[in-house]
Amino acid sequence: MSEKPEKIVLASGNAGKLEEFGNLFKPYSITVLPQSAFGIPECPEPYPTFVENALAKARHAAKYSGLPALADDSGICAAALNGAPGIHSARYAGDNPKSDTANNLKLAAELVGKADKSCCYVCVLVFVRHKDDPRPIIAEGVWHGQWNDTPLGQNGFGYDPYFYLPEHGKTAAELDTEVKNRESHRAQALAELLRKLAL
């Protein structure tokens, strides 16, 4: 990338994601601002893939903010459920209101009795320099784990308390922040994005 932006807008209202991306970009002296700082309305996510939804959100945020924008579309995919909840992870149990607890309970109920508890977190990041960027930068990270029937840990959000990592003997919510920032699906996708941005 020819010049490094000082500020980018994150196309999300999720406080957990904002903190995570803020920490990951800090070493590069790039400030990550929430789209709420610009009064950006929520972008529809009508598409069946992580890539299409992330691209729509990035263009939407760049249009309203006038800044380069980063969007992520991410979710958990359970092998026994053919990849569900997938793109529906954030609203798996509905919208009234969105709730991590309700989402976790729904997925836990659907995995009861399933022999295959393997699942993965997927993160697709899309960076656009401006709203009409003809060459968006796309990166993907996949973090493999197992569904844990009992929630463990406080250091995380979303499905983290149930996402068990056999190599650590812990759930994602039990990992130290430093480890999570190095190994998570978002960290993997961001590492690929940073390589492509040549920061």
Swiss-Prot record:
Gene3D superfamilies: 3.90.950.10. InterPro entries: dITP/XTP_pyrophosphatase, ITPase-like_fam, RdgB/HAM1. Binds 1 Mg(2+) ion per subunit. Its EC number is 3.6.1.66. GO terms for molecular function: dITP diphosphatase activity; ITP diphosphatase activity; metal ion binding; nucleoside triphosphate diphosphatase activity; nucleotide binding; ribonucleoside triphosphate phosphatase activity; XTP diphosphatase activity. GO terms for cellular component: cytoplasm; cytosol. One of its GO terms (biological process) is nucleotide metabolic process. Keywords: Hydrolase, Magnesium, Metal-binding, Nucleotide metabolism, Nucleotide-binding. Substrate binds at residues 12-17, 74, 157-160, 180, 185-186. It catalyses: XTP + H2O = XMP + diphosphate + H(+); dITP + H2O = dIMP + diphosphate + H(+); ITP + H2O = IMP + diphosphate + H(+). Pfam families: Ham1p_like (PF01725). Mg(2+) binds at residue 73. The active site is at 73 (proton acceptor). Its cofactor is Mg(2+). Homodimer. Belongs to the HAM1 NTPase family. Pyrophosphatase that catalyzes the hydrolysis of nucleoside triphosphates to their monophosphate derivatives, with a high preference for the non-canonical purine nucleotides XTP (xanthosine triphosphate), dITP (deoxyinosine triphosphate) and ITP. Seems to function as a house-cleaning enzyme that removes non-canonical purine nucleotides from the nucleotide pool, thus preventing their incorporation into DNA/RNA and avoiding chromosomal lesions. This is dITP/XTP pyrophosphatase.
